[in-house]
């Protein structure tokens, strides 16, 4: 662990570089185009279907 005390700044530079690179890549994402081309999620299997009829919640009027 002695090398960590000597070369901590190199590790810090690598981490800062990774964060800056990630920010640059996230800026390139076109959110509107992504949301327009997003695939539909398939319906999920409801494992609680047999208990759905036994709800204790009050009915909405």
UniProtKB/Swiss-Prot annotation:
Predominant location: membrane
Annotated segments matching region Disordered: 38-61
GO CC term (a single one): plasma membrane
Bias-annotated ranges (Basic and acidic residues): 38-48
InterPro entries: UPF0370
Localization in the cell: Cell membrane
Transmembrane segments: 3-23
Recorded coiled-coil stretches: none
NCBIfam families the UniProt entry points to: PRK13664.1
Family stated for the protein in its record: Belongs to the UPF0370 family.
UniProt protein name: UPF0370 protein Spro_3503
Lineage: Bacteria, Pseudomonadati, Pseudomonadota, Gammaproteobacteria, Enterobacterales
């Amino acid at each position: 662990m002695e090398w960590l005390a000597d070369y901590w700044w190199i590790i810090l530079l690598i981490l800062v570089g990774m964060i800056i690179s990630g920010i640059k890549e996230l800026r390139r994402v076109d959110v509107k185009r992504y949301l327009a081309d997003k695939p539909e999620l398939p319906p999920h299997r409801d494992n609680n279907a047999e208990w759905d009829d036994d709800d204790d919640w009050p009915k909405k009027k």
